[in-house]
């Protein structure tokens, strides 16, 4: 009887935990999302609007958040037509964390100078794998109050 239970248990299919990918998939997702993250920041550095916009999900569900609140949609996004770029952008502590298969969270600390004004804060991205490759589905930027020392970790 013990033998039958052991055999039955050994032959029973094991269900994977929801939201957890195989290690190779998590690693690949993380590497690919980080590559897109770096592409996004590099496009800002090079003021390459086409490359910058190509990193984003171009749908009505693109989420952009900051101190003024959540805004949705690609079509009404001011970045599509703006000619403003920061004079300098220093991005540090770039980190990515796999959430589930095809979804990766990313964050970085920033210091940006534009027109003799420097501010710093934290920016976040949520990367999703699409049939067209990896895209940014959520982007945020939260600046520190003026005069506050950098505190990002």
Which positions does each model-derived feature cover?
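Bacterial N-terminal signal peptides
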Residues: 1-8
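Short, low-complexity N-terminal intrinsically disordered segments enriched in polar/charged residues
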Residues: 11-55, 147-153
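Short beta-strand edge/turn micro-motifs at domain boundaries
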Residues: 12-18, 120-153
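Post-signal/leader-peptide non-cytosolic segments of secretory proteins
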Residues: 23-31, 44, 53, 71, ...
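Hydrophobic pocket/interface hotspot
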Residues: 40, 52-53, 60, 77, ...
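A short gly/proline-enriched turn/hairpin at secondary-structure junctions
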Residues: 55-71, 82-85
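Short, well-ordered beta-strand segments in beta-rich or mixed alpha/beta enzyme
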Residues: 56, 62-65, 103-113, 126
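Surface-exposed, charged secondary-structure patches
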Residues: 75-120
């Amino acid at each position: 009887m013990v033998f039958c239970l052991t055999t039955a248990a050994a032959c029973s299919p094991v269900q994977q935990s929801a939201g957890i990918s195989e290690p190779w998939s998590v690693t690949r997702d993380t590497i690919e999302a980080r590559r897109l993250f770096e592409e996004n920041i590099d496009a800002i550095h090079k003021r390459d609007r086409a490359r910058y916009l190509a990193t984003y999900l171009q749908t009505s569900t693109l989420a952009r958040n900051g101190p003024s609140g959540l805004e949705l949609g690609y079509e009404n996004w001011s970045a599509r037509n703006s000619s403003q770029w920061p004079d300098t952008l220093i991005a540090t502590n770039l980190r990515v964390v796999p959430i589930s298969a095809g979804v990766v969270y990313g964050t970085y600390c920033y210091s940006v100078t534009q027109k003799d004004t420097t501010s710093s804060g934290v920016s976040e991205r949520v990367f999703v794998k699409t049939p067209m490759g990896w895209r940014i589905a959520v982007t945020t930027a939260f600046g520190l109050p003026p005069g506050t020392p950098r505190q990002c970790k």
